[in-house]
From Swiss-Prot:
It is found in: Nucleus. InterPro entries: Hir3/CABIN1, TPR-like_helical_dom_sf. PROSITE patterns: TPR_REGION. The keyword Nucleus applies. This is Calcineurin-binding protein 1. GO terms for biological process: chromatin organization. SUPFAM superfamilies: TPR-like. Residues 894-923 have a biased composition (Basic and acidic residues). It comes from Arabidopsis thaliana. Disruption phenotype: No visible phenotype. The double mutant hira-1 cabin1-2 has aborted and fewer viable seeds. Expressed at low levels in seedlings. One of its GO terms (cellular component) is nucleus. The lineage of its organism: Eukaryota, Viridiplantae, Streptophyta, Embryophyta, Tracheophyta. Keywords: Chromatin regulator, Nucleus, Repeat, TPR repeat. Residues 1818-1832 have a biased composition (Polar residues).
Length: 1863
């Protein structure tokens, strides 16, 4: 805008200057430059790429960029990070001369992102190639911290450690590699070399046998193990003035190792003299390292540590193709097998897992992050709470110091001199705590060089003595611990020795940066400033000396000397120093006491005094109960004005002892027993004791516990800390109780310094546990389950104590308290501990229980301060009408401690018991914990506070109990699912009570949808309250009321709705006592949990799915369904035990029983049918029981109903229950033989139903009430006028309902048929309810004018004028008959209206319409009735199907557009639904009637389709299964009737139609023929069983007359398969089977006779035949002879046998001694082949049936035929004596082949030729083999595929003994 204004400015004469580019434009320019640099790098133009990337780093916008936090996603810092990484790549490509620049780039990049393991890998690789093994090791270790599974860093670190020579670390890394890859060859080799102890003497051992080697690492100076001795020999042969050593890394440990290796006599360097000057060469010059550090400090700003590590956006924007991160396993195992690599990659975890926990970050810092703001401001020191790490030097600074020392001491006299200088240098320059390894090396070097000719300076001796003493504080740190004090004594003695020799003490202060020489010291002798310095340093030196001497005296148990030494030290520190500053002496190299002050010395002196008092005075005072005096005596000594950190706790063999700890324990006991309690001293005691224990455990140190430390000792210290934390909790409870009793709750209950100090120490405890235990679950998953329970408990106790300490301050706001609980909950949840731990009562979830109690007390306090009723409601659904007293009562019930048993854990002394009692009192009065002081806040702040409390409560209850009241989605923030969130498995009844009281207000105010959310919780509670107490169940008044057989329902039903009915039925419910007495008994039996019992079951019943209709069909019929119904009803019955007058429970219970009856009958009608229902009596019993219980529940509901609508509804339900018992429906009744008996019970139910419908109608006039009353009037036999008037009233109340219209005119039809055509009164009544008004007028006119039955006619008859009387009576009869027809047609017309249009599926009216037509009996009425009802049983696709649909009153049909008769334009629609059982009943009733109509109309085809369709119908086959035989009987009856009518007309029976159908029916349904013949619908002479079987024999005879061999074979096979089971056979069916077999046999004989050649053979022909068959003269041929007795049979009708004989005798009479020389003629070959197969089937399948034995077969010579010698017994004639089936098979075989063989040969041939051919392309037809003359050659058999076993010993029957035909 400014530029535009400047351009448009025409008046200004000055030239405008453009503005600077925006920050976004500059960032874009830098991104583009970075992109160009990447392209140049990709193109290998390294110089240009270097120029571009350096320009990015030098840009001012990059150098001046600042961010607040490291997590801030800053584009510029991403760009800077990537530029540094790629610039390092450029330097690497430029060569080794640029390696230092690349190193600097990597160091700067690491400052930006220290979590990039790939970057650490590059840095380590580069520094290794430069010889910087220390930096390389550091880099690879940091890379593993970032990514613990990084193979690159792991393997490279192993090689660097080999190069360094660190054997212990090398073995650890090798084991780490083997844990991830057990077959790693290099790691196995390294581990074997290090652990190998069997090497030869004087040979390299352990790590000395290894050389570093890695494909991607370069080592500048590899150790030559094999050439080492040769080099040493070479150096020993010539004099050398200086020995050079290569320092692998610039560290104290490396330098000390070289010196020790020279001076130690057992080292391999024994050949080198320790007095030869040595030169130490560094791998990298000090200048380069220092320069790199300076460059780093110059380039990297203070905000560089805040750079975000996310660089993916830069990569996308720049579009560069340079890959920023290399793969973890890239080219690391070139010789690895593919299968091994795949397995390794499959088991590899994603890289993200390595970054989930930042190992470089102290995990305990989260404690301060969460809780720092909640520590009271006074006395809180962040360093004391969370930052406990001693300052140690980093590798780079140590590298610089070591390098400086080496450079300064190049001129030396050998190893001894170098070691002496080194010890002096460290003693003066040490400003940090030395590592353990460095300290041990220093002490070892000191021992080796102790007796060198030059003495140590006193400062050096004092330094060494302090170092030895510091190690003695942890005796387990060094193997020779007892010798430490000897060494301390030695060095102190050396100091005295040097002083006694007047050795000038070097006064150079240890804190200065340079070391003074002797000459420089002398130059300061005359200067005043130097004198002051000398005075201070001298005092400092001797103060340190006397302090150490005092400590040594205490260890020697010389306390007097120790006191003397302390006083001397105090005198030195007490003198005035330089200026006014307090005297402070630094001891930076010591771990424990790092500084000496006056307060420290005074504290130690006080401890000596306390020790004296504990040994002499205190025990006697405690014994005499002088508790206050003890407190006054010890408190000033233990608690001086300024607090002192503890120095030591003495460790003995028996355990841990300390004078201070002993004094504190005595003082604590005295405070507990003194009256009143000195709160400040009491709390200070616990604060100081916890402080001493924490410092004794070493929690203030960051040094890793060495491997040689004693685990038992550490555990004992931790146990003491945990016990003290528990004691602090008891202390807080006692202090609170004491202050509450004194009435000082309005003031500060404890000193803020004391409270803040304990809070800081508790934070320290929590931080220590997090640092040393909980962090392991992230860094080492194997230890995730190894966290000790004591650590968890201690952590939780510390958190609870921290929170309770805050509550002691009355000035803390309520919001502050709630926020602290929320923070602590989040913190505990982070480590999965929010639900862990046990409180004093042994209940799980100690913190959550404490939090819930406090939050509910706070909530009550806040709500009581709100005057408006709107403020009372919880956000989770408390009703607005809930008053303040109810809220208070609810909260108190939740918070009252239920467990009064405090004897679960025995106390060690009386004081602990007293503390437990007071804590119990405090827990019972939690609601008083909130101070009366209430802040004046705005209404909005109160609402916000309320919401905060509710959210905290919701989360606590969700974690502890699994409660989630927020599933409705109305809350913005969902509840967090923590690691150990409860799933609602409550362990005790007390837990259930707490939860239930919490949710009760919400549940009462919720709808069913809200209760569904609580279903899981309510179920969990019910596990502990599964049923009421046993004494209530034993005398269960509800069950007795529901099942009492002596209860008179009729009386109750009569009194229902009257005044006093509730009292009457209550007496029936509780007969022996009053309602008040019953409630008192409930209180006595369920007192502790009465509220739970009183509400649980009702709420659970409302939340559960109590309706079985939602289950799968038929569910209620199963055992599971019965149990489901019982469980649901039990819930309401249990509730009614405690709330006997709850209307909702009675009503719902009655509905459940009614629904069970409905489902039982509906599902029973569909899934069991009538027959199955009769077999299961238990189902009928369930129906009757549920009906009775439903009626009684509804009667009780009626007594409790208040409004008229409720009473009307209950009356209607009761009436329907009674009415349902009256209906003749399935599955109780089958509409055929089983019908309801209209006995006294039936009549009583009718009357009760009528009564309740009448009462319901009086409350609310509903058309259905009048409708049912009309039907009941008909059942009770009331006058026609009453029932029709009810229907008329129903039609008036609901003009659109079709139900009353249908029922009105259906009843009129029934009455017209029942009363007859001459009942004047009935006709008059029926005429008044005509559908058509014109017919009504006509009928009434005729009835009014008729003379039939009038008084005048009767008078004439009395006077004797009979002829006139008869004439007038006949005329009246005709008129009445006309009226009857008019009314009948009117009713039919009305029913026709009920099935028009969209009401076409209103099947009730259609059935009544068909019934009316059928009963009218007109000429075409039968056909019309069938056509009308056929709508329900046919469709456009099928001639018979059940085309009916269940009437549903909920779905309103469309309105008719066509007006009805007489202008009736009412739009009728269905209003009453139809039950499934009623629908199935209608189907059955209509089906029976429709089958009758089909039979009477002789519709055979539809009947045939009917019974087939009924069996296969998927929907209704089971429902109408018992009606299928009825349909078959109707079908058979129709067939028989049809044949009888044809026979009477003289026609011939057609076996292919009716007879064939009867036979097919016999095959399919023959087993039920006896039942069919005895059905009432089919019983008659024409359908008797014998008559039906006669038709079967006729069918067989017809087939035999027509010689249908194939058909006879088929029916034989069907009969054999159908009746092979003896149970399905009877005498009639057996006769049919024998007849069919005989007919098949005779048909085969006739067919064979028809194709057998009959021409005679002359002698010439006979002789001519012989040569053609191989010139054999004895060839025999088959001769066939049939006898005349062929047609005689014992079970056939003689007339039928005569018919067969007359037809086939001429054919069979020709077969007399016929010789078969050749096969049949060509035209009959196919027939012969078919007959051969049929004979073979007859041979296989024919059972033991008596067959005609008049078939004779012979073998004869051809020459005997002309001579007439073919007689049995003659020479050359052999009789074939086999069975008839075998004879037929031989006969057919001979006709087909022209020759005959043995029976076994024929059978074998048939077996092989009737099997399927397996060979591809083989023909399926039989091949007739060529037969040579005389029969010597047999047919070649086909390949045998399947073995077939032929019965009747087929191979045993031979045809003769002729050799020409072998078997």
């Amino acid at each position: 805008m400014f530029s535009i204004a400047a351009i448009n400015d025409t008046e200004s004469t000055e030239k405008w200057e453009p503005l600077a580019p925006s920050k976004e434009a500059q960032e874009f320019h830098l991104s583009q430059t970075y992109h160009d640099g990447l392209l140049k790098l990709q193109a290998k133009d390294y110089d240009k790429a270097r120029e571009l990337l350096e320009s990015i780093l030098k840009d001012p916008i990059i150098t001046n960029s600042k961010v607040e936090t490291i997590a801030n996603d800053n584009h510029l810092h991403h760009l800077r990070f990537l530029a540094l990484k790629n610039l390092a790549t450029v330097f690497l490509e430029l060569g080794s001369s640029h390696y230092e620049n690349a190193l600097n780039c990597y160091l700067q990049a690491i400052d930006l992102d220290a979590k990039d393991s790939v970057l650490w890998n590059h840095l380590g690789t580069l520094s290794c190639s430069m010889g910087l093994l220390s930096i390389s090791r550091w880099a690879f270790e940091q890379g593993l911290l970032c990514s613990p599974n990084n193979w690159n860093c792991m393997e490279k670190l192993l090689e660097v450690l080999i190069a360094v020579g660190d054997e212990v670390s090398c073995l650890s890394v090798a084991n780490l590699i083997l844990r991830h890859w057990p077959s790693h060859s290099r790691a196995l080799h390294v581990k074997h070399c290090i652990e190998d102890t069997d090497s030869a003497p004087f040979a390299p051992k352990g790590i000395d046998k290894l050389e570093p080697q890695h494909v991607r690492l370069k080592f500048l100076g590899k150790r030559k193990v094999s050439d080492m001795n040769q080099d040493m020999d070479a150096t020993s042969k010539k004099l050398r003035k200086r020995v050079q050593f290569k320092l692998p890394e610039a560290s104290w440990v490396a330098l000390l190792n070289i010196l020790i290796g020279i001076v130690h006599p057992s080292r391999e360097t024994v050949g080198i003299s320790a007095d030869i000057p040595i030169t130490i060469e560094l791998s990298l010059s000090t200048e380069a390292v220092m320069q790199g550090m300076k460059k780093k400090d110059h380039c990297v700003d203070s905000d560089s540590s805040n750079v975000s590590v996310k660089d993916c956006n830069i990569e996308r924007e720049s579009g560069g193709s340079v890959k920023e991160k290399e793969p973890v396993f890239s080219e690391e195992h070139p010789q690895e097998r593919r299968s091994t690599r795949l397995e390794r990659l499959r088991n590899q975890k994603p890289e993200k897992e390595g970054l989930e926990f930042d190992n470089s970050k102290d995990p305990s810092s989260d404690i301060l992050q969460y809780l720092e703001k909640f520590v009271l401001k006074r006395g809180f020191d962040r360093e004391s709470a969370g930052s406990f790490c001693n300052e140690e030097s980093d590798p780079i600074s140590e590298h610089a110091v070591v390098s400086n020392f080496v450079k300064e001491n190049l001129e030396n006299y050998g190893a001894y001199h170098m070691g002496h200088l080194l010890l002096e240098y460290i003693a003066n320059k040490c400003e940090h705590v030395l590592s353990r390894e460095t300290a041990l090396k220093i002490l070892e070097l000191e021992k080796l060089t102790r007796h060198w000719g030059r003495d140590r300076k006193p400062e050096c001796s004092l330094f060494l003595a302090e170092l030895y003493h510091d190690f003695d504080s942890k005796r387990s740190d060094i193997p020779d611990a007892p010798s430490c004090m000897v060494e301390v004594t030695y060095h102190l003695s050396k100091i005295i020795e040097s002083v006694s020799l007047d050795y000038a003490i070097d006064s150079t202060p240890s804190s200065r940066g340079k070391m003074f020489s002797d000459s420089s010291f002398k130059s300061f002798q005359g200067d005043e400033a130097a004198k002051e310095v000398l005075d201070y340093d001298t005092r400092s030196f001797w103060a340190r000396y006397f302090w150490l001497s005092a400590r040594l005296s205490i260890l020697e148990d010389n306390k007097a000397k120790a006191l003397e030494e302390y006083l001397r030290c105090l005198s030195l520190l007490g003198r005035e120093g330089i200026g006014e500053a307090p005297v402070l002496i630094q001891r930076p190299h010591c771990r424990r006491v790092r500084e000496l002050t006056i307060n420290r010395i005074i504290h130690e002196i006080n401890l000596l005094k306390i020790d004296f008092l504990l040994e002499n005075n205190i025990p006697e005072m405690m014994e005499k109960e002088f508790y206050s005096e003890c407190v006054n005596l010890l408190a000033p000594l233990l608690f001086p004005d300024k607090d002192i950190l503890p120095a030591y706790a003495v460790k003995t063999e028996e355990g841990i002892s300390s004078v201070e700890l002993s004094a504190l324990e005595v003082l604590i006991k005295a405070c507990q027993k003194s009256k009143p309690i000195d709160v400040e001293v009491y709390m200070n005691c616990h604060r100081r004791k916890l402080q001493v224990l924490l410092d004794s455990t070493g929690t203030g140190e960051s040094v890793v516990t060495p491997k040689t430390s004693s685990k038992n000792s550490s555990e004992s210290w931790d146990h003491l800390v945990a016990e003290e934390v528990k004691a602090i909790l008891l202390c807080i409870s006692q202090v609170k109780n004491s202050l509450d009793q004194s009435g000082n709750s309005d003031d500060m209950v404890a000193p803020r310094d004391c409270v803040a100090g304990i809070q800081a120490l508790l934070l320290r405890v929590m931080s220590n546990i997090v640092r040393h235990f909980f962090s392991k679950r992230y860094s080492d998953s194997q230890n995730a389950d190894g966290i000790e329970e004591e650590k968890k408990s201690c952590f939780l106790d510390a958190a609870i104590g921290f929170c309770k300490l805050q509550h002691l301050d009355a000035t803390i706001s309520t919001k502050y308290q709630v926020e602290l609980i929320i923070r602590l909950h989040d913190l505990l949840a982070e480590y999965g501990l929010c639900c862990a731990g046990k409180n004093c009562a042994g209940e799980e979830g100690a913190f959550l229980r404490f939090a819930i109690k406090h939050l509910l007390a706070v909530d009550m306090k806040v709500k009581s301060s709100i005057n408006s009723p709107d403020g009372l409601g919880h956000d989770m659904g408390l009703p607005d009408k809930l008053c303040r007293n109810e809220v208070k009562s609810f909260l108190e019930e939740v918070h009252v401690e239920k467990n009064e048993n405090n004897k679960t854990e025995s106390k060690k002394d009386g004081s602990e018991e007293q503390v437990g009692y007071r804590e119990k009192e405090q827990s019972e009065q939690q609601s008083k914990q909130i101070p009366e002081h209430t802040e004046e806040v705005a209404e909005e702040e109160k609402d916000e506070l309320e919401l905060l409390i509710n959210n905290a409560l919701d989360q606590c209850f969700f974690c502890l109990y699994g409660l989630n009241l927020r599933v409705d989605g109305s809350y913005e923030d969902e509840l967090a699912v923590h690691k150990n969130t409860s799933r609602g498995d409550y362990q005790t009844k007390e837990q259930c009570v707490d939860v239930f009281q919490y949710i009760l207000p919400y549940a009462k105010a919720s709808s069913r949808t809200g209760l569904v959310k609580l279903r899981r919780v309510l179920r969990a509670i019910k596990k502990h309250f599964s049923q009421p107490p046993d004494d209530l169940l034993i005398g269960n008044v509800i069950d007795k009321f529901l099942d009492d057989p002596e209860l008179c329902e009729d009386k109750l039903s009569y009194e229902a709705g009257s005044e006093g009915f509730l009292e009457t039925i209550t007496k029936c419910l509780i007969p022996s006592r009053t309602l008040s007495e019953y409630k008192i008994s409930l209180l006595h039996s369920s007192d502790p949990y009465l509220d739970v019992y009183r509400n649980l079951y009702f709420l659970l019943a409302q939340s559960e799915e109590v309706s079985a209709s939602d289950k799968w069909p038929g569910f209620v019929l199963t055992k599971e369904g019965e149990e489901f119904e019982q469980q649901n009803t039990n819930l309401f019955k249990y509730d009614l035990l405690y709330n006997p007058l709850r209307f909702e429970s009675w009503e719902k219970l009655g509905n459940i029983y009614d629904e069970e009856v409905d489902l039982l009958l509906n599902d029973g009608s569909k899934h069991i049918n009538v027959v199955g229902w009769r077999k299961n009596s238990a189902l009928s019993q369930r129906v009757e029981t549920s009906r009775r219980r439903s009626r009684r529940c509804l009667l009780m509901s009626l007594a409790l109903a208040n409004s008229p609508d409720q009473q009307s509804e209950i009356h209607e339900l009761l009436a329907l229950v009674y009415y349902d018992s009256l209906q003749s429906v399935v599955p109780f009744y089958d509409q055929r033989s089983v019908l309801p008996s209209k006995d006294a019970t039936w009549t009583r139910f009718c009357e009760n139903s009528m009564k309740h419908f009448n009462k319901a109608f009086s409350h609310r006039q509903d058309w259905s009430h009048a409708f049912y009353m009309g039907k009941l009037s008909e059942k009770l036999g009331h006058s026609y006028e009453i029932s029709l008037s009810y229907y008329k009233q129903a039609m008036t109340l609901n003009p659109s309902a079709v139900d009353p219209v249908y029922r009105m005119h259906a009843s009129r039809l029934k009455l017209l048929n029942a009363c007859g055509k001459q009942n004047l009164e009935a006709l008059k009544v029926l005429a008044s309810y005509c559908f058509d008004e014109s017919i009504k007028d006509t009928a009434m006119t005729i009835i009014g004018t008729t003379t039939f039955g009038s008084s005048r006619t009767l008078e004439e008859a009395q006077d004797g004028n009979l002829e006139a009387c008869y004439a007038k009576s006949g005329e009246g009869s005709i008129q009445m008959e006309g009226v009857w027809h008019m009314l009948y047609n009117d009713s039919l017309s009305a029913l026709g209206i009920c099935v028009e249009g969209d009401l076409k599926h209103f099947h009730k009216a259609r059935y009544m319409l068909a019934q009316g037509l059928y009963r009218r009996g007109g000429s075409s009425d039968l056909q019309r009735a069938k056509e009308e009802l056929s709508f329900c049983f046919k469709s456009s696709r099928s001639s018979f199907t059940i085309n009916m649909w269940e009437i549903d009153g909920m779905v309103k049909k469309g309105r008719r557009k066509t007006p009805g008769l007489a202008g009736n334009k009412k739009a009728l629609e269905v209003n009453l639904p139809e039950s499934s059982r009623k629908f199935i009943t209608c189907i059955r009733k209509y089906l029976l009637f429709y089958l009758r109509l089909l039979e009477e109309t002789e519709d055979v085809n539809t009947l045939e389709r009917a019974f087939n369709s009924l069996r296969s119908d998927k929907r209704f086959s089971l429902c109408v299964e018992d009606l299928v035989p009825v349909a078959i009987g109707r079908y058979v009856k129709a067939l028989v009737s049809s044949m009888s009518r044809v026979e009477s007309a003289g026609a011939i029976i057609n076996p292919d139609s009716q007879l064939e159908k009867i036979f097919s029916l016999f095959i399919e349904q023959g087993s039920i023929w006896p039942d069919i013949c005895n059905f009432p619908e089919t019983r008659g002479p024409e359908t008797s069983e014998s008559s039906l079987y006669r038709y079967l024999h006729q069918y067989i005879v017809s087939l035999e007359l027509d010689n249908k061999v194939e058909t006879l074979e088929t029916i034989n096979e069907k009969i054999r398969k159908r009746f092979k089971n003896p149970k399905l056979s009877n005498s009639f069916s057996a006769k049919v089977g024998r007849h069919a077999s005989l007919a098949w046999c005779r048909a085969l004989i006739i067919s064979l006779a028809l194709i057998t050649p009959l021409q005679p053979v002359s002698s010439e022909e006979s002789q001519a035949i012989t040569p053609s068959f191989g010139l054999l003269e004895n060839r025999r041929v088959l001769c066939v002879d049939l006898q005349s007795e062929f047609w005689s049979s014992s079970f056939e009708d003689p007339l039928e046998s005569q018919m067969l004989e007359a037809k086939w005798r001429p054919v069979l009479s020709k077969i007399k001694n016929v010789l078969i020389f050749n096969k049949v003629v060509e035209g009959n070959l196919e027939i012969a082949n078919s007959l051969l197969k049929s004979c073979y089937n007859f041979f296989r399948e024919t059972a033991s049936v008596t067959l005609p034995s008049d078939i004779n077969l012979y073998f004869a010579l051809p020459r005997l035929a002309p001579a007439g010698e073919l007689l049995p017994g003659n020479e050359g004639v052999e009789v074939i004596d086999v069975s008839i089936p075998r004879k037929l098979l031989l006969w057919a075989y001979t006709l087909f082949h022209g020759h005959c063989g043995s029976i076994s040969q024929v059978v074998k041939y048939m077996e092989e030729n009737t099997k399927p051919k397996m060979k591809r392309g083989a023909s399926t037809s039989s091949v007739v083999p060529s037969v040579q003359s005389g029969g010597t050659s047999e047919p070649e058999p086909a390949p045998k595929v399947v073995q077939v076993i032929i019965p009747d010993s087929l191979g045993g029957d031979s045809c003769g003994s002729t050799p020409a035909a072998p078997l």
